[in-house]
Amino acid sequence: MVRKNKINRASGTTKHLKDFPSVILSLPSYNPSILSKNATALITGGSSGLGFELAKELSRRINKVIVADIQSFPTFAQVEYNNIFYYQCDITSLDEIKNLKKAIERDHGNINIIINNAGVAHIKKLEHMTNKEVEQLIDINLIGAYRIISTFAEDMIDNREGFIINIASVLGELTPARLTSYGASKGAMIGFHKCMSRHFRSLSTECNKTGIKTLLVCPGKIKTNMFIDVPTPSKLLAPDIIPSQLALAIISAMEHNHLQTLNAPYYVNLVPFFKTLSWPYRHLLKHFSGMDHVTSTSPRAINPKRSA
């Protein structure tokens, strides 16, 4: 069942974008940004964390923001934003996503921007994970994003315009202890995004059918509830990311038509180099960084937590 709530709007203030590559924030734009148009965005997992910050910031720049989440939108925000619209939707259900599309088309028209942000994490040894837990995690973190794109992208292709953003994680490239299933889902998201982007580019060059832009976001540890009980092993080398700052960096990348990968903070850009090292050196790196220790000693409950 899709349930809609209307959220009221408030004005915002400019925040400083620290810990992000300045080149991304100052790229020249040779094509008009989709944010300069009468756009409507759909954000999954937008009731908290990064998704909530993206919803607030986008509401100040575009016509409408649609939040689709199984969790309710925060009560305190319901009196502050008038162009954010909440729909309750479980992205593991294709029927609910199809009903969501019908409701959005009826109430708001077509979607121009998709941000796949919804996600869950289990901090458990792989052998202690049940099949149901693994299936649920993959269903939300990967297949749910596929369902959203396959359902809404057809209109983007017909209109020859759109922007799709997939939120992955550096843990899809280098995974610490007890996050095997989560790392696998985010690694699969990275691979899916690359294949999807090539597909849309081929449509554009071969058939002139689409102007869909894509952006992959690979952040480090974001300071949200998902990993709230996992301490940062090194605030100097791998600082937590403030969700509001990452949201602004993503929007800046959209404004400048940055169409590759947004890595944040700086150390994420070094991960491809780490992956070229032989396994003994990777093992030593993970040991001295403390990343395995903080996840293996986390008091995390078994139940998953939604939203990045």
UniProtKB/Swiss-Prot annotation:
SUPFAM superfamilies: NAD(P)-binding Rossmann-fold domains
Swiss-Prot/TrEMBL keywords: NADP, Oxidoreductase
InterPro entries, A to Z: NAD(P)-bd_dom_sf (IPR036291), Sc_DH/Rdtase_CS (IPR020904), SDR_fam (IPR002347)
EC category name: oxidoreductase
CDD domains tied to this protein: 17beta-HSDXI-like_SDR_c (cd05339)
GO molecular function: oxidoreductase activity, acting on the CH-OH group of donors, NAD or NADP as acceptor
EC number: 1.-.-.-
Residue positions of the active site: Y182, K186
Binding site for NADP(+): L50, D90, N117, Y182, K186, I222, T224
Entry annotated with the keyword Oxidoreductase: yes
Family classification: Belongs to the short-chain dehydrogenases/reductases (SDR) family.
The protein, known as: Uncharacterized oxidoreductase YDL114W
Species of provenance: Saccharomyces cerevisiae (strain ATCC 204508 / S288c)
Taxonomic lineage of the native organism: Eukaryota, Fungi, Dikarya, Ascomycota, Saccharomycotina
